[in-house]
C-alpha cells in the first residue's frame, strides 16, 4: 500500500515521530524486506528474538518515513555512517539536506527529522537509578542540585537530564565519546530549555536549544540542536 509523500521540515522545524516497536509486529516481514545487507547482518547478531524484532521494526519504520520525504521506496534510501557512527542519507535531491536521528528505549522509538541542521533525539525509560549513575552523568554542580532534590523527584529528574545530554551529544554526532558533563543543565528547569554550559562555555551554550518530549508513561525524552528559533512538530 502506497503512502503519501511528506513535505520536508523548514529551517524552523523539527519533525518528531514516535511509535511502539512492539505494536508493529504485523509489519515485521515487510520491514525486514526494506533493510540493507548491512542491516540484515546486524539484525542477525542479536542474541534475543525480541531485540532483533525491535531492531528490524525500527530500521524499517525509519526507511519508510525517510522514503516519504525523499519520494523513494524504503529500500532505496541510502544510509551511510559518519566517523562516530551517526547515520545520514546520501541520495537526497540536489539542494536538500534532511538530517535525522533515531532513538529507542525498550519498546519506545522516536525519530527527529530536521531541514538543514544536525539534530539529536533521545528517549529513556524511567527505571531504578544505580548508585554510580549520577557520578557518571552529572557535573559537580548538577550533582549538588540532584542530591538536594526530594528522593521522590530524583528518578524523573535524572532521566530527563540524561535524555537532554544524550540528545545534545547525538546532535554533535559523538554520542558518549564525549563525557556526559560536556552538556551541563540547571536541574530546576523543566520542559524546553538550553544548557547552562557546553564544553564548559556559557557562550557556546547560548547557541543550543533543547525541547522536551513526552514519549509515554514512565519515559523521558528530549530533542537538541545547535540552532535557535526552531520548534517541534509532532507527526503522529
Could you say what each language-model-derived stretch is?
Residues 1-236:
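Core catalytic alpha/beta fold that binds nucleotide/phospho-ligands
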Amino acid at each position: 500500500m502506497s503512502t503519501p509523500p511528506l513535505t520536508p521540515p523548514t529551517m524552523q522545524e523539527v519533525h518528531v515521530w514516535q511509535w511502539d516497536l512492539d505494536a508493529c509486529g504485523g509489519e515485521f516481514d515487510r520491514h525486514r524486506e526494506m533493510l540493507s545487507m548491512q542491516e540484515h547482518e546486524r539484525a542477525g547478531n542479536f542474541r534475543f528474538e525480541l531485540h532483533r524484532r525491535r531492531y528490524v521494526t525500527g530500521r524499517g519504520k525509519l526507511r519508510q518515513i525517510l522514503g516519504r520525504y525523499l519520494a523513494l521506496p524504503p529500500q532505496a534510501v541510502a544510509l551511510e555512517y559518519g566517523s562516530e557512527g551517526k547515520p545520514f542519507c546520501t541520495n537526497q535531491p540536489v539542494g536538500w539536506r534532511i538530517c535525522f536521528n533515531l532513538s529507542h528505549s525498550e519498546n519506545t522509538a522516536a525519530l527527529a527529522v530536521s531541514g538543514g541542521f544536525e539534530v539529536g533525539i533521545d528517549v529513556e525509560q524511567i527505571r531504578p537509578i544505580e548508585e554510580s549513575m549520577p557520578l557518571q552523568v552529572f557535573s559537580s554542580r548538577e550533582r549538588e542540585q540532584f542530591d538536594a532534590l526530594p528522593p521522590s523527584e530524583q528518578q524523573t529528574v535524572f532521566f530527563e537530564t540524561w535524555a537532554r545530554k544524550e540528545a545534545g551529544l547525538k546532535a554533535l554526532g559523538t554520542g558518549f565519546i564525549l563525557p556526559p558533563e560536556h552538556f551541563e543543565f540547571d536541574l530546576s528547569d523543566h520542559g524546553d530549555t538550553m544548557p547552562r554550559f557546553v564544553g564548559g562555555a556559557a557562550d557556546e551554550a547560548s547557541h543550543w536549544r533543547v525541547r522536551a518530549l513526552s514519549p509515554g508513561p514512565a519515559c523521558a525524552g528530549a530533542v537538541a540542536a545547535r540552532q535557535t528559533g526552531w520548534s517541534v512538530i509532532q507527526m503522529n
